[in-house]
UniProtKB/Swiss-Prot annotation:
Native source organism of the sequence: Avian infectious bursal disease virus
Domain of life: Viruses
Binding site for GTP: G259, L260, P261, Y262, V263, G264, R265, T266
Region spans: Disordered: 846-881
Posttranslational modification: May exist in multiple phosphorylated forms.
First-tier enzyme category under EC: transferase
A GO term, aspect molecular function: GTP binding
Name the UniProt record assigns to this protein: RNA-directed RNA polymerase
A single cellular component GO annotation: virion component
Reactions mediated catalytically: RNA(n) + a ribonucleoside 5'-triphosphate = RNA(n+1) + diphosphate
Function: RNA-dependent RNA polymerase which is found both free and covalently attached to the genomic RNA. May also contain guanylyl and methyl transferase activities.
Localization of this protein: Virion
Amino acid sequence: MSDIFNSPQARSTISAAFGIKPTAGQDVEELLIPKVWVPPEDPLASPSRLAKFLRENGYKVLQPRSLPENEEYETDQILPDLAWMRQIEGAVLKPTLSLPIGDQEYFPKYYPTHRPSKEKPNAYPPDIALLKQMIYLFLQVPEANEGLKDEVTLLTQNIRDKAYGSGTYMGQATRLVAMKEVATGRNPNKDPLKLGYTFESIAQLLDITLPVGPPGEDDKPWVPLTRVPSRMLVLTGDVDGDFEVEDYLPKINLKSSSGLPYVGRTKGETIGEMIAISNQFLRELSTLLKQGAGTKGSNKKKLLSMLSDYWYLSCGLLFPKAERYDKSTWLTKTRNIWSAPSPTHLMISMITWPVMSNSPNNVLNIEGCPSLYKFNPFRGGLNRIVEWILAPEEPKALVYADNIYIVHSNTWYSIDLEKGEANCTRQHMQAAMYYILTRGWSDNGDPMFNQTWATFAMNIAPALVVDSSCLIMNLQIKTYGQGSGNAATFINNHLLSTLVLDQWNLMRQPRPDSEEFKSIEDKLGINFKIERSIDDIRGKLRQLVLLAQPGYLSGGVEPEQSSPTVELDLLGWSATYSKDLGIYVPVLDKERLFCSAAYPKGVENKSLKSKVGIEQAYKVVRYEALRLVGGWNYPLLNKACKNNAGAARRHLEAKGFPLDEFLAEWSELSEFGEAFEGFNIKLTVTSESLAELNKPVPPKPPNVNRPVNTGGLKAVSNALKTGRYRNEAGLSGLVLLATARSRLQDAVKAKAEAEKLHKSKPDDPDADWFERSETLSDLLEKADIASKVAHSALVETSDALEAVQSTSVYTPKYPEVKNPQTASNPVVGLHLPAKRATGVQAALLGAGTSRPMGMEAPTRSKNAVKMAKRRQRQKESRQQP
C-alpha cells in the first residue's frame, strides 16, 4: 500500500479517476493528499484586544470581582459526616481541603488552550493512513463505480476543508456576540409569564413532551431532596467490618473541569471541596430563610450579601468546544461551553439527575408522547420512527432539547433552535425547575423536597446559570441566555421547543416553511431555523426497500456498493433498509460519518492516555466503532477500517498487550460510546454482530408519576387555551406542605419527649414532694418547648408559602466596566486585601485566620474586620459555660 503513488500506472489511474492534472514540479500525491494545515494567527490573543473587540460589539465586560485565597483545613473538621470515607481503602477524600475563605483575595484568570495553532499546527492530524488505505482499495477494483469514487472524494474533501480542534479566542468572542444578538436582537427573549403562561400550564405541556417519574426505583426508593450533599452518602455497618455505602449523589464526570475557584483542576481532584462548598451554601441559605430572608415584604439584603460572597458560583469558565470546524471559518466559529463551578453543577444536578436518569419515557413506550429523550436508534428504535413517519396521520411532531421534527404534507422538517441556549430566560428555567420539583420530586402528590431546596431551585439556581457571567483570560463578562453545558441545559432547551410546538398547535399546525409558522419567533422570543426538509418523505423511505444492496444486513456479505439512505438528520442519524431483518436501520449521516473518519479526536481520557499501547487500542476501537455506526454500509470505508483495525490488533498481540483489557474500556475511547450504552457490544463487526445490534427488542417500560394524555400535545394545548384544565396545587402549596411537615415533625418529637418523660417518672403517691415537683418542672419545660416549636412551625410555614409564591430570582448586581483597558489590566491575578464579606463562610465553619497585628490590621478592609469580629464573638460564646 505504501507504493500506491510510486507506480506510474497507479498515478495514471488516480489522475484519471479524480480528474487530477499535475503540472510541472507537482505529483499526484501532493495534489490528492492535503498538506499540513497551519491555522491563521488569532487576532484576539490578548486580554486588551479581546476586551476591545467585545466593547466595540456592544458586549458587557464586568468589573472584575476577586476571590478569597484558598486555605487548607482538615477534611474531618469540614466534613464530619464523611469522616468514615477516609478510613476506606482507595477513599477519594484527601486529608485536607482547600477552601476559598482566606483574608487575602485575588483576581482569577483562565487561559484556554486552542489547538491546532500557528505554533502547533499538527496537534490533531487527519487520518492520512485511512485515506491511503481507501485509495489503495479503490485501485484494486477493476471497474470502480461512482459510489466508490465518491467515498474517496468525500474523505479527501473533509481532510482538505475541515480541521479538528478547539478554535480561537476570536471564534469564542464572535460566538458570544452572536448569542447576544439572538437574546436581544430581532426577536428579543421574552419571559413566558408575560405571554400568558403560568408555571403550571408549562408543566402540563411538559407532562406530554417530557413525562417524568420519581427518582429511585420501587425496590430502592431515593432519599428526599432535603439534605446537604454530604448526607447523600449513607454508611451502613462498620468500616472495620462489613459495611455498605448507599450513594444518592448524582452521576458526575469527575474528569471534567472543576471551574472556579479551582481553575486548572478537575472535579475528581476537588470532590471534597465541591461537597463542602455546596454544604455550606445550602446551610447558609437555610439559616437565612429561617430568619425570613427572601419572604414577602422582608429585607433581602442578607440573602443578596450571601450571594455576593458566593459570586463565583455564577461564573463559568468559557471553555472552547473541540469540534471538526471548517477551515474557511476557523477564526470566527468556535462553540463555547460554560464550564460551571463544580458546586453549582453538583447542586443543580442533585435536582435534575435523579429524576431524569430514571425517566426513560419517549415516543417508543408512551402513546401520544413526542419526546426523543433517551431514544436510541438501534434495536429497532429507528424503525419505529420510520413507521411513525409512514403512518398517514399528520401533521405530527417529535422533540428533543433544541431539535424539533415535523411531518407535514408528506414533507419531513428538521428544525433547530438558533443558538438554543441564548433563547433561555431565568423564568424559563424557573418553569423547568417547577416541573422537576412538582412532577419528579413527588410521592403520590406529597413533596420530596423542603423549603431550602425549593428556594434554591426556583429563586437562586436560575441566576447562577442564566444571564450570569463567565471568565476568559482575566476578563469577567456577561453571558446571554443559559450557559451551555450546565446541569439544566437539556430540560431548559426542551421546554423552549415545547413552547414552539404549543404555539404551532394553537395556530392549527401551519407548514413549518410558512410565514405563519415563522411568526412564532416574534411571539415567543425564540429563534429557530429549518436545517433540512425532505419532500415526499414516505415515497423516499419506501424506495429504500426496493433499492437495498447486498451487504452485511442484506445477504450477510461484505458490501460491494452502498445501499441508499434517507438523511433524516434525526439526532444525526439517517435511515437505510435491511432485507435480512426486514426493518429500517440507522447509519450515521454521511457527511458526519466521513468527517469523523477524516479527523480522529485521539485519546481524550487523561487517565488512559498514559497507558502503554493505548494508541493502538484506540485505533482498534475507533475503526470498529466507525463501522458500527454506519461505515459497514460503505464498501471502501468499511474495508479500510477493517484492515487498519486488524493491523492495530496484530501489533498489540505481537507486543503482548492485553487487548481484552483495553477493549473493556472501549466506550471511554470512542466518541460514539454513548450510542451503545447498555449494549453488550463485541468490537469485531460481522453480519451477526450487526444483526444483534439492530434486532428489535421491546422498549423499556415507562416510569411516570402521572398518566400521559394520549390525545397528545395538541389536545393539551387546546384545553389550556379554553380553560378546560384546572390549575392544580402549585409549587407554593407543595412547599407549604413540605415545610409544615418538617417543622410539625419537630413539634411532634418535642411532644413525644414530654410524654416519654411522663411515663418514665410516674406520679408515685409515695414519692416525696421534691421528686414530684422536679417531675412536674421537667414536664412543663418539655411542654413549653413543644408549644414554641409548634408555633414556630406555623409561622415559618406561612413565610415559606409567601417566599416561593414570588417569581423573582435573587441575584446581586455586578457593575459593568466602561473602559476595556481597565477590565484587562495586567494587575489581574495579583493578591490583595479582602474587599467583601467572604468571611461569612469562614464564620459559620468556625475557621478563621489571624494576622500579627490582630483584627485591626490596616491592610484589612472594613468587611474583613467585621467578619473577624464576628468570628471572635462566636469563639467567645462557645467558651462560655
